[in-house]
Amino acid sequence: MTDNPIIWQPDTERLKKTSMYCFMKEQSFDCYDDLYQWSIDQTADFWNALCDFCDVRFSIPANKALIQPGDMTTAKWFSGSELSFAEHLLRHSGDRAAIVFRGENGARSELSFDELRQAVADIAQGLRSAGVMKNDRVVGYLPNCPEAIIAMLATASIGAIWSSCSPDFGINGVVDRFGQIKPKVLFCADGYFYNGKCHDSLKAVRGLLANIDSIEYTVIVPFTGQEFEATDIRNTMHWQDFAEQGAMLEFTQVEFDHPLYIMYSSGTTGIPKCIVHGVGGTLLQHLKEHVLHLDISSVDRLFYFTTCGWMMWNWLVSGLASGATIILYDGSPFFSSDTILWKMAEEEKLTVFG
């Protein structure tokens, strides 16, 4: 067999500007294979070096990067350390765009890093006033919109645990997931758009509340721009009313392995199984993938086609930690044209498209 031709290869000048090249040089490696071998032979040294390279900030440093490295089931990472996931995703500031939202109906909006930081502070204070504390669960039944990211970061900032589903999930599918984790607060939208149609979400929300009695507050995002009636939904608050304007941004420091996200298996063999992802592991793994493997930085505009019900949403949002502008798209990828995402890529000057 003949080797397939190389489609593209970076020149030496471009290669030397990448984060991977700089990281290898810092660790005195000239060959990627040697770097890889070191990363699996000296695992603790590799992850310590990555923390330094990516400026991971521990409020309490670890006693040791890795304890009992030979056994995956008993290994303990960065024991004794504390940090904040939200603090790392919100460490950038200024008027540069943090989030750009695009909808299939042509809607477009932007949030700067400063605006994002303030919005997270306001919602976090609303959560505190609602009695949400460390270890409580907060859930989102939301379109792929900026409010979903704000609610997640606000949740993480106080040490609570986030879980989300896309609004195209049916009532039973959402109850099977959220019902297992006993959430205290539900963030939802009045509806969403898909393939040119506006779909009501509040009927499903009523069904969720009838089946999940742990939910104490329901916060509604007015996503569709249409008037809605929700007086019959218990303890309902409008997004703007729930946010406590002018709050200070604070970050609760938590253990490295403190739960950050609850995600789910597909549910094809029974009720979906809960999968917990920790604060430190999620942050480090995403930084490794973004910074080393994709060379993402503050000059990038990062997009991945996803919904809030897929793990790639969580992966996309972590691009904020590298200072990238993340692009959200909600709706059908083929509405009005089968090239709608490519047109968006051109208009938004995307540098990473997934």
Predicted ranges, named:
Residues 19-21, 25-27, 86-115, 225-230:
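AMP-dependent adenylate-forming
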Residues 33-38, 99-153, 170-175, 231-241, ...:
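Conserved AMP-binding/adenylate-forming core of the ANL superfamily
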Residues 95-97, 218-220, 231-264, 271, ...:
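Conserved pre-ATP/AMP-binding loop-to-beta segment of ANL
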Residues 105-106, 262-274, 290:
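Conserved adenylation A10 loop of the ANL superfamily
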Residues 124, 137, 143-171, 181-186, ...:
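A short helix-loop-beta submotif of the ANL/AMP-binding
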Residues 142-143, 163-179, 191-193, 197-201, ...:
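ATP-dependent adenylate-forming carboxylate-activation enzymes
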Residues 157-240, 349, 354:
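Structural core segment of the AMP-binding/adenylate-forming
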Residues 281-301, 311-351:
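Conserved AMP-binding/adenylation subdomain of ANL enzymes
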